[in-house]
Amino acid sequence: HAITDGEFRRSYWHLDFMWGFHGIEEVELDHGYFFHGEETTHGSIKVSGKISGENHPFVEHYKFVKQFEDENCIARQTMPAPAQLLAELYREENGKNTDAIYPDHEQLLQDIAAAYRTVIQELYAVGCRNIQFDDCTWGMIGDPNYQNFLKETNTKVEDVAAEYLRLNNLALENRPEGLTITTHVCRGNYHSTWASEGDYFTVAPFLLAQ
Protein backbone atom coordinates (compact mmCIF):
# COMPACT_ATOMS: atom_id res chain seq x y z
CA HIS A 1 0.00 0.00 0.00
CA ALA A 2 1.10 3.59 -0.66
CA ILE A 3 0.20 6.78 1.17
CA THR A 4 0.43 10.42 0.01
CA ASP A 5 -0.44 13.80 1.47
CA GLY A 6 -3.53 13.92 -0.77
CA GLU A 7 -2.15 17.11 -2.36
CA PHE A 8 -3.75 19.14 0.45
CA ARG A 9 -0.57 21.23 0.66
CA ARG A 10 -1.05 22.43 -2.93
CA SER A 11 -3.26 24.98 -4.61
CA TYR A 12 -3.02 23.04 -7.89
CA TRP A 13 -2.17 19.40 -8.49
CA HIS A 14 0.72 20.38 -10.77
CA LEU A 15 1.63 24.07 -10.67
CA ASP A 16 2.92 24.16 -7.09
CA PHE A 17 5.55 21.59 -7.99
CA MET A 18 6.56 23.57 -11.07
CA TRP A 19 6.83 26.78 -9.03
CA GLY A 20 9.36 24.96 -6.84
CA PHE A 21 11.96 24.88 -9.62
CA HIS A 22 14.60 27.58 -9.93
CA GLY A 23 14.04 29.57 -13.11
CA ILE A 24 10.25 29.25 -13.03
CA GLU A 25 7.88 31.88 -11.66
CA GLU A 26 4.20 31.89 -10.75
CA VAL A 27 1.99 33.97 -13.07
CA GLU A 28 -1.70 34.59 -13.71
CA LEU A 29 -3.11 34.26 -17.22
CA ASP A 30 -6.21 35.94 -18.62
CA HIS A 31 -8.23 32.77 -18.05
CA GLY A 32 -7.88 29.32 -16.54
CA TYR A 33 -8.15 25.81 -17.91
CA PHE A 34 -11.45 25.07 -19.59
CA PHE A 35 -13.08 21.93 -18.30
CA HIS A 36 -16.47 20.58 -19.36
CA GLY A 37 -18.78 23.42 -18.37
CA GLU A 38 -16.36 25.03 -15.92
CA GLU A 39 -13.23 27.19 -15.87
CA THR A 40 -10.46 26.93 -13.30
CA THR A 41 -8.53 29.75 -11.66
CA HIS A 42 -5.86 31.43 -13.78
CA GLY A 43 -2.52 30.24 -12.42
CA SER A 44 0.36 29.22 -14.68
CA ILE A 45 4.15 29.39 -14.97
CA LYS A 46 6.77 31.56 -16.62
CA VAL A 47 10.43 30.86 -17.33
CA SER A 48 12.65 33.52 -15.78
CA GLY A 49 16.07 31.88 -16.14
CA LYS A 50 17.87 28.56 -16.27
CA ILE A 51 15.65 25.79 -14.91
CA SER A 52 17.14 23.69 -12.11
CA GLY A 53 15.79 21.54 -9.29
CA GLU A 54 18.00 21.86 -6.23
CA ASN A 55 16.39 22.39 -2.79
CA HIS A 56 12.89 21.70 -4.08
CA PRO A 57 10.19 22.37 -1.43
CA PHE A 58 8.44 19.07 -2.15
CA VAL A 59 11.28 17.27 -0.39
CA GLU A 60 9.87 18.66 2.86
CA HIS A 61 6.38 17.59 1.77
CA TYR A 62 7.65 14.06 1.39
CA LYS A 63 9.41 14.05 4.76
CA PHE A 64 6.09 14.90 6.42
CA VAL A 65 4.37 11.89 4.82
CA LYS A 66 7.28 9.52 5.47
CA GLN A 67 6.78 9.72 9.22
CA PHE A 68 3.55 7.74 8.78
CA GLU A 69 5.18 4.79 7.01
CA ASP A 70 4.92 1.39 8.68
CA GLU A 71 5.32 -2.26 7.73
CA ASN A 72 2.08 -2.11 5.73
CA CYS A 73 2.54 1.07 3.68
CA ILE A 74 5.15 3.18 1.92
CA ALA A 75 5.16 6.95 1.41
CA ARG A 76 4.69 7.96 -2.22
CA GLN A 77 5.60 11.36 -3.67
CA THR A 78 3.43 12.48 -6.57
CA MET A 79 4.46 15.16 -9.05
CA PRO A 80 3.48 16.31 -12.53
CA ALA A 81 5.43 14.53 -15.25
CA PRO A 82 8.18 16.42 -17.11
CA ALA A 83 5.94 16.39 -20.19
CA GLN A 84 3.29 18.23 -18.18
CA LEU A 85 5.79 20.96 -17.35
CA LEU A 86 6.77 21.28 -21.00
CA ALA A 87 3.12 21.49 -22.04
CA GLU A 88 2.52 24.27 -19.51
CA LEU A 89 5.52 26.21 -20.80
CA TYR A 90 3.86 26.27 -24.22
CA ARG A 91 0.30 26.77 -23.02
CA GLU A 92 -1.22 29.54 -25.15
CA GLU A 93 0.99 32.65 -24.94
CA ASN A 94 3.51 31.07 -22.55
CA GLY A 95 5.47 29.71 -25.49
CA LYS A 96 6.67 33.13 -26.63
CA ASN A 97 8.42 33.79 -23.33
CA THR A 98 9.74 30.23 -23.16
CA ASP A 99 11.35 30.52 -26.59
CA ALA A 100 12.78 33.94 -25.70
CA ILE A 101 14.54 32.54 -22.62
CA TYR A 102 15.37 29.22 -24.29
CA PRO A 103 15.98 29.81 -28.01
CA ASP A 104 17.65 26.38 -28.07
CA HIS A 105 14.73 23.98 -27.58
CA GLU A 106 16.98 21.00 -26.98
CA GLN A 107 18.64 22.85 -24.10
CA LEU A 108 15.20 23.42 -22.59
CA LEU A 109 14.45 19.70 -22.72
CA GLN A 110 17.82 18.84 -21.20
CA ASP A 111 17.42 21.36 -18.38
CA ILE A 112 13.91 20.14 -17.52
CA ALA A 113 15.11 16.55 -17.42
CA ALA A 114 18.14 17.48 -15.30
CA ALA A 115 15.95 19.44 -12.87
CA TYR A 116 13.72 16.41 -12.39
CA ARG A 117 16.71 14.15 -11.88
CA THR A 118 17.94 16.52 -9.17
CA VAL A 119 14.60 16.42 -7.36
CA ILE A 120 14.44 12.64 -7.67
CA GLN A 121 17.93 12.32 -6.18
CA GLU A 122 17.07 14.67 -3.31
CA LEU A 123 13.90 12.73 -2.55
CA TYR A 124 15.82 9.47 -2.66
CA ALA A 125 18.40 10.88 -0.24
CA VAL A 126 15.70 11.41 2.41
CA GLY A 127 14.27 7.93 1.96
CA CYS A 128 11.79 8.18 -0.90
CA ARG A 129 11.47 4.91 -2.82
CA ASN A 130 8.17 5.49 -4.63
CA ILE A 131 7.46 8.36 -7.03
CA GLN A 132 4.41 8.86 -9.23
CA PHE A 133 4.40 11.01 -12.37
CA ASP A 134 0.94 12.49 -12.94
CA ASP A 135 0.54 13.13 -16.65
CA CYS A 136 -2.50 14.58 -18.40
CA THR A 137 -0.61 15.26 -21.63
CA TRP A 138 -1.54 11.85 -23.05
CA GLY A 139 -5.24 12.49 -22.62
CA MET A 140 -4.74 15.89 -24.24
CA ILE A 141 -2.97 14.38 -27.25
CA GLY A 142 -5.79 11.87 -27.69
CA ASP A 143 -8.45 14.59 -27.74
CA PRO A 144 -9.82 15.19 -31.28
CA ASN A 145 -10.07 18.92 -30.56
CA TYR A 146 -6.38 19.11 -29.69
CA GLN A 147 -5.50 17.04 -32.72
CA ASN A 148 -7.39 19.51 -34.92
CA PHE A 149 -5.46 22.36 -33.30
CA LEU A 150 -2.19 20.63 -34.15
CA LYS A 151 -3.28 20.20 -37.75
CA GLU A 152 -3.92 23.94 -37.99
CA THR A 153 -0.33 24.58 -36.88
CA ASN A 154 1.08 21.91 -39.22
CA THR A 155 2.26 19.87 -36.24
CA LYS A 156 2.10 16.08 -36.26
CA VAL A 157 0.48 14.40 -33.28
CA GLU A 158 3.17 11.73 -33.41
CA ASP A 159 5.92 14.35 -33.10
CA VAL A 160 4.37 15.81 -29.96
CA ALA A 161 3.90 12.37 -28.42
CA ALA A 162 7.48 11.40 -29.25
CA GLU A 163 8.85 14.54 -27.61
CA TYR A 164 6.81 14.03 -24.43
CA LEU A 165 7.93 10.41 -24.28
CA ARG A 166 11.58 11.32 -24.76
CA LEU A 167 11.47 14.03 -22.10
CA ASN A 168 9.84 11.77 -19.51
CA ASN A 169 12.41 9.07 -20.18
CA LEU A 170 15.31 11.55 -20.06
CA ALA A 171 14.22 12.57 -16.57
CA LEU A 172 14.40 8.93 -15.47
CA GLU A 173 17.91 8.26 -16.71
CA ASN A 174 20.30 7.04 -14.01
CA ARG A 175 17.54 6.83 -11.44
CA PRO A 176 18.64 5.32 -8.14
CA GLU A 177 18.50 1.58 -7.60
CA GLY A 178 15.42 0.43 -5.74
CA LEU A 179 13.33 3.47 -6.69
CA THR A 180 9.89 2.65 -8.07
CA ILE A 181 8.48 5.04 -10.67
CA THR A 182 4.80 4.85 -11.56
CA THR A 183 2.58 7.08 -13.66
CA HIS A 184 -1.02 8.23 -13.49
CA VAL A 185 -2.76 9.23 -16.72
CA CYS A 186 -6.16 10.89 -16.93
CA ARG A 187 -8.17 13.47 -18.84
CA GLY A 188 -8.25 15.98 -16.01
CA ASN A 189 -10.57 16.29 -13.02
CA TYR A 190 -11.92 19.59 -11.70
CA HIS A 191 -15.05 19.47 -9.56
CA SER A 192 -15.70 16.08 -11.20
CA THR A 193 -15.60 17.56 -14.71
CA TRP A 194 -13.09 16.68 -17.44
CA ALA A 195 -10.78 18.66 -19.70
CA SER A 196 -9.93 16.16 -22.45
CA GLU A 197 -11.91 13.45 -24.18
CA GLY A 198 -11.24 10.72 -26.70
CA ASP A 199 -9.46 7.37 -26.68
CA TYR A 200 -5.84 6.41 -26.10
CA PHE A 201 -5.23 4.63 -29.41
CA THR A 202 -3.15 7.55 -30.70
CA VAL A 203 -0.76 7.54 -27.76
CA ALA A 204 -0.69 3.82 -26.92
CA PRO A 205 2.39 3.12 -29.12
CA PHE A 206 4.29 5.74 -27.10
CA LEU A 207 2.79 5.65 -23.61
CA LEU A 208 2.25 1.91 -23.26
CA ALA A 209 5.00 0.51 -25.47
CA GLN A 210 7.93 2.80 -24.74
Regions found by a protein language model. Give the residues of each.
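Domain-level signal for soluble alpha/beta catalytic cores
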Residues: 1-210
